[in-house]
Amino acid sequence: MVTITAREDIEQALANPDLVPLPAEGGPEGSMAWLRATVARFAHGEVHARRRAYVEAELARIDGDALRRLAAGTDGDDRTRILRSLARAMDLPELDEAAVKALLTVAANYFGGEDPAADDAVRLLLPLMRTADPEQAANRIGILVQACDATAALIGGARDASGDVHQALRANPPVQVMRRTAIVATRVGDTAIAQGEPVLLEVGPLGLAFGHGPRVCPGRSLALALAEGALEGR
């Protein structure tokens, strides 16, 4: 494994199209493996660009101030409030307890795992995404799942920082490392990286928790709105 800690090299790595999140293998439609293989997060190249454009368009429809108010007025623990507020902002149905549980199950298996309950969770969620396009439905689930744990961690950190979300983001960012895999042999700075080599990027101390370059998180402002709203409504 190659570990990269210098900001310049991390930014170069995040902009390198040959360093990608570990690609998903895929599976039958409606399974957890299929979801991983269908979201923008684990895609690369033209497929990633197309899926990311859809995600960006979905997020662009959401008003940050309205989302903040939704988060302030929604009941439940932090993850439940995040999921229900964001779903409402996306014009999805009200999430009942079963839907929230399903999203939490998917979140727990998003980066790997073979829990059969995750397949059932994906199948429960797909009809709630209000689209007949399976790829769009998968990426709507992805938006919800990717907002869940990281934003909840940011809220928890902000509570420890007297409610200051921006201070928490600087002092204790919810994402400390990012992982990449070289799909071909490549180079970052003076470091040669072999094909298939795993790469660990220590982004947390450098203020790069939302990434950099073509894969920078498109939901940064909405994550902050969710966190601030949740803290207002505590």
Regions found by a protein language model. Give the residues of each.
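Active-site substrate-recognition loop segments, prototypically the cytochrome P450 B′-helix/B-C loop
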Residues: 1-94
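Cytochrome P450 heme-thiolate "Cys pocket" and heme-binding signature region
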Residues: 205-234
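Conserved cytochrome P450 K-helix E-x-x-R motif and the immediately C-terminal K′/meander segment
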Residues: 128-132, 162-197, 201-204
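Central I-helix of cytochrome P450 enzymes
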Residues: 82-83, 102-107, 120-166, 227
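Flexible, acidic/His-enriched mid-domain "rim/lid" segments that flank
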Residues: 73-123
